[in-house]
Amino acid sequence: MNSLAPNAVLQFGQSWLDRFLPPRPQGRVFLVGGAYKCLLHGRPPRDLDLFCADVNSRREVLVSLRSHGARTIADNPPYQETLSLDGLSIEVAYDTTQSTLEARIDSTDIALSAIGCERGPAGDRVLVHPLAHVSAARREILLLTPLVNWKYALYTLERMHRYAEELGFVVPAEQEEYVWQLFLAQPAPERWSMIRRYKLVSAQSGPISERAMSLCAEVSA
């Protein structure tokens, strides 16, 4: 059985979107990202990542969430506003530049995050990147290269290891090495900027930032 088959992804997306959105809202919202790992490990999601096609769609989603009892627990512009609904964390991105599900999927860096369900006036539809199927079949965490969000590659590496731990998968050595080679290929000011960005978005910021700083020192020596 293919856990990431379109019908399974659609049923999963609908089961969660139905909790706070009508079947055919005026705007369009995309439930994209790591929540679909639940189809592989069988546990409920800890959080949902919502992206909207435009500002009006985002406003509609927030109004609908609050009408269902959601409350804001963190606001971190220009990245996301985080709401809590019945113990579930829901992150609503500020970025609305990707106006289609295809564009949103193309903006991800990890294959198992390149899965999404769109809800809009025309109903629901899903999209699963082909490499997500490969990742699941191999039980490996794979990158979508070249990385679109390469400036946040260190955080992507952290997420890769978190995904692997949650799923019992592995991070192939060549995938991890790709990130470090990308990091080392940058000029020194950009390498330090990548470290600063990582520390801003990471809740851990331990071994990865330490290795990054060590590599910077080695290159400078």
What does each of the following model-derived ranges do?
Residues 1-221:
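Catalytic cores of the polymerase beta-like nucleotidyltransferase superfamily
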